Curated annotation (Swiss-Prot):
GO function terms (MF aspect): ATP binding; heptose 7-phosphate kinase activity; heptose-1-phosphate adenylyltransferase activity; phosphotransferase activity, alcohol group as acceptor
Pathway(s) per entry: Nucleotide-sugar biosynthesis; ADP-L-glycero-beta-D-manno-heptose biosynthesis; ADP-L-glycero-beta-D-manno-heptose from D-glycero-beta-D-manno-heptose 7-phosphate: step 1/4; Nucleotide-sugar biosynthesis; ADP-L-glycero-beta-D-manno-heptose biosynthesis; ADP-L-glycero-beta-D-manno-heptose from D-glycero-beta-D-manno-heptose 7-phosphate: step 3/4
Name of the protein in its database record: Bifunctional protein HldE
Top-rank EC class of the record's enzyme: transferase
One GO location term (cellular component): cytosol
Record: residues binding ATP: 195-198
Active site: 263
Similarity annotation: In the N-terminal section; belongs to the carbohydrate kinase PfkB family. In the C-terminal section; belongs to the cytidylyltransferase family.
Sorted UniProt keywords: ATP-binding, Carbohydrate metabolism, Kinase, Multifunctional enzyme, Nucleotide-binding, Nucleotidyltransferase, Transferase
CDD domains for this protein: RfaE_like (cd01172)
Listed GO biological process terms: ADP-L-glycero-beta-D-manno-heptose biosynthetic process
Amino acid sequence: MLSKKPNILVIGDLMIDHYLWGSCDRISPEAPVQVVNVKKESSVLGGAGNVINNLFTLGTTVDVISVIGDDNVANELKSLLEKIKISTSNLIVENNRKTSKKSRLIASQQQVLRYDMESIDDINEESHKKIISNLEKNIKKYSSIILSDYGKGVLTTKLTQDIINIANKNSVKVLVDPKGKDYSKYKGSYTLTPNKKEAQEATNIDIKDENSLINALKDLKEKCDLEVSLITLSEQGIAIFDENLTIKPTVAREVYDVTGAGDTVIASIAFALGNDLNINEAVSFANLAAGVVVGKLGSATTTLDEIYEYESSLHKSNSNSHIKTFEEIEKLAAKLHNLGKKIVFTNGCFDILHVGHVKYLEEARSYGDVLILGLNADSSVKKLKGESRPINNQDDRAYILASLESVDYVVIFEEETPYELIKLIKPHVLVKGGDYEGKDVVGQDIADELKLVKFVDGKSTTNTIKRIQENEKCNN
């Protein structure tokens, strides 16, 4: 357990990420553009602010130094920081500067437009002096410094080098989320956290195999005089090079959104190092944190409890973790709806699994993003099929079905029909067998769409049981 609450300083470009959510169903009569009916809007900390958010949710003590304007966006930014109890006393105001705000217009879960209002000029000399003065007074209280560079003018080459020099004199590690192609301004820092594309641009090395990866890591380490070089490799994990190459594989099970995952990585590494983990252990911890975050929508964060729970779940049976109770599936379905995922629902007894079942479920899964299967409990099967059924009990049937790639979640229901379960899930697509053609299907008044899937001819549990019984007669 990581129990320390290290004091970490974040210096960089603060901004507001502003979201407008709505729907679009017509074209403007004034110009060939979509008309979006905005239904809600929200604002969150962006840029270096997302790093701060990540550190805060991990339980870290966080200080921030940045330069902002004297405007409404700055006031909004301060308010968001104060909500998470982050001091704004070290935010330096330049009157002619625009505080960065990025607005994204999202319609039907698709981003259709982004517009930015900001200044990207270098900060002035007075701001530079104030930052250095503040740092020199307080440097000894920090376990590490994160430089979050978004190229908006705060982290000038001179300021960056001055920060690194002061930190090194006081044995404080500097971790950098870099920007641009020239990384020379970060020389002397502890490590950088570029992604693969950024590393390729900075080193002019095409990373296509292990040798080219090592060459890129070596190039970064030598040119920037790093203690350790890192490259984040998306779904492949994180590559580390001190004297030898180590790749920490990703541990994400479900990826919904990678937005802000880089901020989670650098924050988690700094937090772990502040808890006396070595760099390999810190990167493993960061991989777990990123695994949680990419399962959420937008620039998300994670808590220590979520990380520990996630790590624990990775060691559990994969099939068991996909078998849910009514309460669990209700919460999960709500989350999936919020993430904009298309939910497919089907149900049945699935007593003796055969190829017809498998093909049916594969087709059902193709109609959306997530397939939830309602499984008749043993008592329900007996009512439908007779006292001799089921052949396999409900736990065995659920486990086997949950192990199929096409099935995301299984829920056992005791009732004669899955109507109450469907009400909880509110699926977008309801799938039933082709033999329901022209018949009423339970739950079709709840789902947006009904799909009827043809069965494979001659394949059924009843036929399978008959063949087994006939073979037994022949053998007796």
